[in-house]
Amino acid sequence: MSRLKGAASKIGWAKEHLDHLDREMGEFLNDPYTITRKDKVNEHRHYLRFEFKPIPVSIPLIAGDFCYCLRSGLDQLAWQLARINKVAQPRTATSFPIFSTEPPDGFKDKTKDILPRAVEVIEALQPYHRGAAFKEHPLWLLNELCNIDKHMLFAVHSVAGTVSILNVEVPYRRELQFGFEVGVSLSDKLNVQWEIPKTAIIFGKPANVRGEAFEIEVSTFHTIYRFVEDEVIPEFEAFFK
């Protein structure tokens, strides 16, 4: 198991990044709005403005660290599977392939030095076995995330349901780029309350990047991690005993 330990440790370190991401997101989502209030006596109105705070850059950075650490763990696994195949110095192309279509030549190139029985396991884990649903496969998602992060920061934005204004009539509402503004009667100023719904952070490609849109929530990062930890790594443990 000692050869597997390095890859397993890398994957375990990815979990550290994921836990860090959860903490950073939790801190932000606990108070996602800037709320400002002002009176306009001449209009006999009290205005409240709700605007999303900028998402800290640490959030997409940590998400990228998680993805690359997890992907690196799979490549280290492939390298060690070549080492136990009596290949002292595996070829630089040796890595854990992830393909959405039937293996092209690139699959063989990446797995040429790997123990043949292990290659069969790797092939069985490929996203293309899900047919048209390959984009739902955790490994495809991981690969897509790494391809995005390799070239740019993840685009991130906040989404939430409608903030409810309670106890008073709201005769005025105006949408803003990152929030909204409401106006209530000045006499209702001390009575107004609000309820903020659950807010989520969406990760994806920047809007100006060519290709299909790609967006996920943090729950998908957890799904990807659990798949690698619970369904990929155990498939190879027998090779290292």
Tell where the protein language model's regions lie, with residue ranges.
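Acidic, Ser/Thr/Gly/Pro-rich intrinsically disordered interaction regions
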Residues: 1-241
